[in-house]
Amino acid sequence: MNFFLAIILTIVYCAIIKFVPVQFIFSTVGVVILAIIFDAIIVNIGLGVFNLIPLPPLDGSKVILPVLPYKAKYWLQNNEQIFYTIFLVLWVTGLAGKFISPIISWLASQILSLGGFIFGL
């Protein structure tokens, strides 16, 4: 859902750039509106990437658990609290961002490029 919302917001963002008069885009209100939409795009991509991390207790683990062998599934479920602690430490220290940020940046550039392509920007 987050990726879908990011794509919809990208279409809105590019449509504003394409069809709204330049005077409005460069006005204070226009800049603020575009900044809010752009930030919403990045936040939704970030949430989408975060949701796909395949470690318990995150949502991505629910995607991979059905396809894992029984022993791996059992091990992941029994060690969920350890993964939670590890992930919390990585997040608090900022190390998680070092892995996630490049993915978010790449996806954002791809989605924005798609929007630019659609609107001929």
Residue spans for each PLM region:
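Hydrophobic transmembrane alpha-helices and their immediate loop junctions
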Residues: 1-121
